[in-house]
């Protein structure tokens, strides 16, 4: 179940960033490296809080 949650989280974040092909991304890249802007950051943060009970600062979100 934990693996499923991680995949769901990855898919949700990729969708927010407009990434269609998950296989094509470098998992060592931060969200900022992948093109995260401030509005996307807020959306990622809200998704993490709402769907995964993770509360992160905007700085932490950018470093993901």
Swiss-Prot record:
GO cellular component, one term: melanosome
Enzyme class: transferase
Modified residues (Phosphoserine): 38
EC number: 2.3.1.85
Sites of O-(pantetheine 4'-phosphoryl)serine modification: 38
Predominant location category: cytoplasm
Quaternary structure annotation from Swiss-Prot or TrEMBL: Homodimer which is arranged in a head to tail fashion. Interacts with CEACAM1; this interaction is insulin and phosphorylation-dependent; reduces fatty-acid synthase activity.
Protein's UniProt name: Fatty acid synthase
Gene source species: Oryctolagus cuniculus (Rabbit)
Species lineage: Eukaryota, Metazoa, Chordata, Craniata, Vertebrata
Gene name tied to this protein: FASN
